[in-house]
């Protein structure tokens, strides 16, 4: 009984200290807890006032500065990107890029007046969107146009090569690595010097394609942001060629990207099998065959007359039978090469041999046959 009285007294005292209208502190605490919970989960009204950090800004814009690509290998994205970009092999394209490496080695040596070695790292297929996300920044991206193919390509020069080229062209000492200055845009001098190098590479690329199909490559613009160098849809496939350029202790990489849509007009030519060092028209063999053709021995027949006789008469011919010809001593004979009539001539004698003197130029049929051989 005493315990019940004590409990009632305690409840009355608590009620007097906390009137029904005084529960705002509890509600405020509840609201505060809800606000904290919403802040922890990224929701609620407080989330709209929060300032994003740099990682969240890069993720929102689609940049991946970490370079590990771990996000692409987890979850649903890993399932979506699990299918490898596999397209038909283009044998002649490998020969074109091999020729490009040899041409660039000579051209860049003349361009830099230095010992330059160009090597082909690999040729692969990649989605255009994946390539844009994988470009290491800072870099200079050159958008060029393939005139005859009516499409575009992309050439990427990394930061190491940019500073190396600038250092070499401006008289940097050999044996010292080029100094990199991060955190600033490329200067006008750097862009102009790199543009000259890109024009040399595009000229070599034109020469590499010329034996297969004449293509002119012209520089369209230079970009430093991959988002402004979009020449195809993100899901479109492209050929990626990685080239390594070494200049003693300096150097860098050039990446050449050609969408499959750009190569589509000459796809049949690129599918051909490589049959030798030269492909297409070979001037050496053409001249050799022309020389040998003029010295070829051919059989020429002089036909005096032709007759049609019954088969029975031919089968019954005996020694001593006479066959009368519809020709006189003054009749012209026809000169033939196989079944092709060449010209007509008159028979005679020269020294101790019977000869034929041509009395007319080559017939139209003979000229047409010679043109077919050409």
Swiss-Prot record:
Annotated InterPro entries: CheC-like_sf, Flag_FliM, FliN-like_C, SpoA-like_sf
Keyword Cell membrane: yes
Chief localisation class: membrane
Protein name from the UniProt record: Flagellar motor switch protein FliM
Keywords on record: Bacterial flagellum, Cell inner membrane, Cell membrane, Chemotaxis, Flagellar rotation, Membrane
GO cellular component term of the entry, any: plasma membrane
One Gene Ontology term from the biological process aspect of the record: positive chemotaxis
Localisation: Cell inner membrane; Bacterial flagellum basal body
Organism: Caulobacter vibrioides (strain NA1000 / CB15N)
Biased amino acid composition, Gly residues: 32-46
Pfam families recorded: FliM, FliMN_C
GO molecular function terms noted in the UniProt entry: cytoskeletal motor activity
């Amino acid at each position: 009984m005493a315990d019940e009285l004590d409990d009632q007294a305690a409840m009355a005292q608590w009620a007097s200290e906390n009137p029904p209208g005084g529960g705002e502190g509890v509600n405020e605490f509840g609201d505060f807890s809800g606000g904290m919970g919403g802040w922890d989960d990224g929701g609620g009204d407080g989330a709209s006032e929060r300032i994003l950090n740099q990682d969240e800004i890069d993720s929102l814009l689609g940049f991946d500065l970490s370079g590990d690509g771990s996000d692409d290998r987890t979850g649903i994205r890993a399932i979506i990107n699990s299918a490898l970009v596999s397209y038909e092999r283009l044998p002649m394209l490998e020969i074109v890029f091999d020729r490009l490496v040899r041409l660039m080695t000579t051209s860049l040596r003349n361009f830099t007046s230095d010992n330059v070695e160009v090597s082909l790292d690999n040729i692969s297929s990649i989605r255009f969107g994946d390539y844009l996300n994988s470009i290491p920044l800072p870099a200079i991206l050159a958008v060029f146009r393939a005139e005859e193919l009516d499409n575009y390509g992309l050439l990427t020069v990394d930061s190491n090569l940019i500073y190396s080229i600038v250092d070499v062209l401006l008289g940097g000492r050999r044996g010292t690595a080029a100094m990199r200055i991060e955190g600033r845009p490329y200067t006008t001098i750097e862009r102009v010097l790199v543009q000259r190098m890109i024009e040399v590479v595009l000229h070599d690329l034109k020469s590499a394609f010329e034996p297969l199909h004449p293509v002119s490559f012209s520089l369209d613009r230079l970009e430093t942001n991959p988002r402004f160098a979009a020449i195809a849809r993100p899901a479109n496939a492209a050929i990626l060629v990685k080239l390594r350029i070494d200049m003693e202790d300096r150097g860098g990489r050039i990446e050449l990207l050609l969408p499959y849509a750009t190569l589509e007009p000459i796809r049949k030519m690129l599918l051909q099998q490589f049959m030798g060092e030269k492909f297409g028209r070979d001037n050496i063999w053409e001249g050799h065959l022309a020389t040998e053709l003029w010295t070829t021995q051919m059989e020429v027949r002089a036909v005096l007359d032709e007759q049609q006789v019954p088969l029975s008469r031919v089968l019954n011919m005996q020694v001593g039978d006479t066959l009368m010809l519809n020709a006189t001593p003054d009749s012209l004979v026809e000169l033939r090469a196989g079944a092709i009539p060449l010209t007509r001539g008159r028979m005679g004698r020269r020294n101790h041999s019977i000869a034929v003197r041509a009395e007319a130029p080559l017939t139209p049929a003979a000229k047409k046959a010679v043109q077919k051989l050409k």
